[in-house]
């Protein structure tokens, strides 16, 4: 800039410094209290209660695996060393028992787009919560679900929740840049895809600069990817190339109709529409639903054949208020059988997790800034919601088979 324009430049510098400081503070605290890894572990008795397992099965599997040289995670309790089985330990026990994994049943990943043109409807929170919860839900551990979140929202909110060190400033290895640069699978794995604190859940980050890419998308595709359809880039250049690595792939875009959202629609198998009950949000969601056929028609006119097999709505930010229940009833009229029985309620836990750049699944109760009971309640609701989504996906895929 030629000048400060009444403090614009100065404020930007301060904001950048504060963002970096906030991120560094969180990182320093995690390192200080040894919380840089996912916290949840299981006792042998807890694992024995999981589906398709029993105490005798678990004890026998552990013995056989240790005899073969496998090392289980343990912790010191006083003078005694006890098993503290990690998510991976449990998955390996299932594998030792030859329980089929999800990838043994379905060879290709299922692409899920949580989408709404209204901002502030819990779209990102729903996405990242589902991503983490699908991986660690106790009823789903036997499936060894591998999850990828592709963040195409320049606000990078999903990136903040899943990998906060890459959610500030400008970064080159974003989903938008990867789409344009036509990277091979190995380069995507090594340079673009980032792990999250929950092993088995990865993210491709977004950056504020991606907004400029979206605004010039058609011209950039013509320049860098001649001959490719501008609305099939996400599917062809990212999803298809890492398809063997994941069971579920989530897409997160901003709440505006742009080429990223249309790429998301073109690439998706399932649309999930968060539907808040507040009057203004509910009204805006209905307007989005009326526009959705036009967007799909636009893709068809551009030579794209959408892959959608289902469009499911669910209530977000629900409370027990009477007007919220009224909105829920109206939503049932609109979605009919295409609405989830489970909703994502408005709870303190979902909101406060952002203070430590966590989801309600990844947040460690020992360092969570709010009430441990509130976090537990939010996690319980998140797990119930996640199981409902998984069960609906199984129903949809079963019908299509």
List each language-model region with its residue ranges.
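Walker A/P-loop phosphate-binding motif and the immediately C-terminal alpha-helix
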Residues: 108-155
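C-terminal boundary of histidine-terminating zinc-finger modules
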Residues: 353-379, 385
